[in-house]
Amino acid sequence: MKSSIFVACFITFIIFHSSQAQTPRENFLNAHNAARRRVGVGPMTWDDGLAAYAQNYANQRADDCGMIHSDGPYGENLAAAFPQLNAAGAVKMWDDEKQWYDYNSNTCAPGKVCGHYTQVVWRKSVRLGCARVRCNSGWVFITCNYDPPGNYIDNVYGDLEEQKPDFDSKLELPN
């Protein structure tokens, strides 16, 4: 009797925890939406077409894990790390660029990059698709695509409502 109660409890535990586990798409989406929520930007939705585009490109990078943009029609962030990188880690790397973003001048600090961060929180980018691949080298490559794309010069980050809701944008991005 005790063993059947134990088995029933164990099965219930497994079912409960497996139902609570997030899928990779939920991990990417939740990490992005948490970063956006912190600065007052609405949530994104997952787009299977963007995810397929991202997966196709990630598969192309599996041989070299090269941090080379796809030059596609979408906004895009790339990340790579060894030996592990997950959705939360990639989005954290991009979100951490916030420290170098100056709201008053609407620019990145000299010599720093913040374009990944601005793409994550770009208000008009409302659809997201991401993919992850383990490269032949053992590194992990992640790409996220955004639609509509963000980071347009003269309109970069200009509609974010954290400190300056109605300011003109003049963010200078590195070439």
From Swiss-Prot:
Query: Does Transcription regulation show up as a keyword for this record?
Result: no
Q: Which GO terms describe its cellular component?
A: extracellular space
The protein's induction, as recorded, is: Synthesized during pathogen infection or other stress-related responses.
**Domain SCP residues, every copy:** 29-146
Query: Where does the record locate the signal sequence feature?
Result: 1-21
The record ties this protein, via Gene3D superfamilies, to: CAP
What's a Pfam family this protein contains? CAP
Q: Please indicate if the UniProt record lists Transcription regulation as a keyword.
A: no
Disulphide bonds in the chain: 65-135, 108-114, 130-144
SMART domains linked: SCP (SM00198)
What's a GO biological-process term for it?
defense response
Keyword annotations of the record: Disulfide bond, Pathogenesis-related protein, Plant defense, Signal
According to its UniProt entry, the function of this protein is described as: Probably involved in the defense reaction of plants against pathogens.
Q: Which family does it belong to?
A: Belongs to the CRISP family.
Give the protein's recorded name: Pathogenesis-related protein 1A1
Task: Read off the lineage from the record.
Answer: Eukaryota, Viridiplantae, Streptophyta, Embryophyta, Tracheophyta
